[in-house]
């Protein structure tokens, strides 16, 4: 008999999967952890994990944690603006402000300049792209100038953490000193 089931990254499971899990572990208690803003599957559209109360009805409590220890205050303020939130607080001290630029012209030169500047003060730098195709394109653009750069995609077995290009859906759980999106 399994008494306690812990599910992490709850936002990456759909409601059918939760019904199946609940029916497999009929006599178990559940602890379900997640963040709807970190979903990697665009088809799972939870407004809140509180929606899971429909499935886990017995003695169900919903708690929302509003402090983060991972990201700096500037990153949290920036993402709060994008997500329309204002209740998430950063515990980590101030760091550099996010820098936003949009460019297709001189993309290679801009990326090389930014990577070199970031590498001066940071051990690891990641370029996070929308998908494998975009990651491969950026890798092809930079590989001759940056011999230590690696491409991490769904087929990769290992990668160089110091300088990596990675699609967003494979970046989950990884941490880098600096990130270019």
Go through each PLM region and give its residues.
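Conserved helicase motor core of SF1/SF2 NTP-dependent helicases
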Residues: 4, 11-181
């Amino acid at each position: 008999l399994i008494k306690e089931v812990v599910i992490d990254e709850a936002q990456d499971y759909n409601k059918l999967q939760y019904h199946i899990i609940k029916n497999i572990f009929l006599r178990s208690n559940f602890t379900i952890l997640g963040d709807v803003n970190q979903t990697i599957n665009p088809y799972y559209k939870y407004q809140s994990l509180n929606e899971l109360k429909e499935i886990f009805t017995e003695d169900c409590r919903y708690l929302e944690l509003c402090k983060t220890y991972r990201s700096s205050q500037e990153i949290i303020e920036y993402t709060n603006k994008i997500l329309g939130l204002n209740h998430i607080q950063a515990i980590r001290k101030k760091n550099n402000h996010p820098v936003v630029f949009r460019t297709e012209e001189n993309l290679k030169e801009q990326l090389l300049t930014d990577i070199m500047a970031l590498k001066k003060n940071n051990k690891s730098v990641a370029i996070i792209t929308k998908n494998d195709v975009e990651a491969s394109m950026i890798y092809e653009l930079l590989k001759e100038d940056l011999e230590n750069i690696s491409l991490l995609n769904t087929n990769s077995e290992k990668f160089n953490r110091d300088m990596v290009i990675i699609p967003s859906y494979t970046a989950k759980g990884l941490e880098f000193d600096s990130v270019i999106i």
